[in-house]
């Protein structure tokens, strides 16, 4: 079971997406793939920060009408149990000289709570958080 990081789920939206990543996404059994609420927030923020125009409108529509509906019932919240894991992950990393970005920590904690592998290109924070990681660009 897989939790997609923002850079993975957004890859097909790029003007020239990585073919390997797109093929990997297409090979997945959708019911085994999840998003975190944090990833949804990052995706929506990315669209909101674009200048008004056709690109913003197209990306907004693709996100809200095509991508997010695919994950209905499989968008995992940042709740109290995940918050407790987040605090453990970030404090452990910090006391051991490792840095985990806040958003990556939220996503890592969500993965840990639900025993999921994180699919991401940015593996460092997730390795530091001691969660299972898969990089569809290289693995």
Curated annotation (Swiss-Prot):
Protein name: Toxin FitB
Subunit structure: Forms a heterodimer with FitA, 4 FitAB heterodimers form a complex that binds to promoter DNA. The complex is also seen in solution. This protein does not actually contact DNA.
Organism: Neisseria gonorrhoeae (strain ATCC 700825 / FA 1090)
UniProt KW keywords: DNA-binding, Hydrolase, Magnesium, Metal-binding, Nuclease, Toxin-antitoxin system
InterPro entries hit by this protein: PIN-like_dom_sf (IPR029060), PIN_dom (IPR002716), Type_II_TA_system_RNase (IPR050556), VapC_family (IPR022907)
GO biological process: migration in host
Family, as annotated: Belongs to the PINc/VapC protein family.
Catalytic activity, EC: 3.1.-.-
Lineage, top ranks: Bacteria, Pseudomonadati, Pseudomonadota, Betaproteobacteria, Neisseriales
An MF annotation (GO) of this entry: DNA binding
Keyword NADP: no
One matching Pfam family: PIN
Iron-sulfur is among the record's keywords: no
Stretches assigned to the PINc domain: 2-123
Cofactor(s) required for function per UniProt: Mg(2+)
Binding site for Mg(2+): 5, 104
Phenotypic effect of disruption: Disruption of the fitAB locus leads to faster transepithelial cell trafficking of the bacterium; mutants adhere to and invade cells normally. Mutants grow normally in liquid culture but much faster within human cell lines A431 and T84; these latter 2 phenotypes were observed using MS11A bacteria with a disrupted fitAB locus.
Gene: fitB
Task performed by this protein: Toxic component of a type II toxin-antitoxin (TA) system. Plays a role in the speed with which bacteria traverse human epithelial cells; disruption of the locus increases the speed of trafficking about 2-4-fold. FitAB binds to its own promoter better than FitA alone. The expected nuclease activity was not observed for the FitAB complex, perhaps because FitA (the antitoxin) prevents metal binding and thus catalysis by FitB.
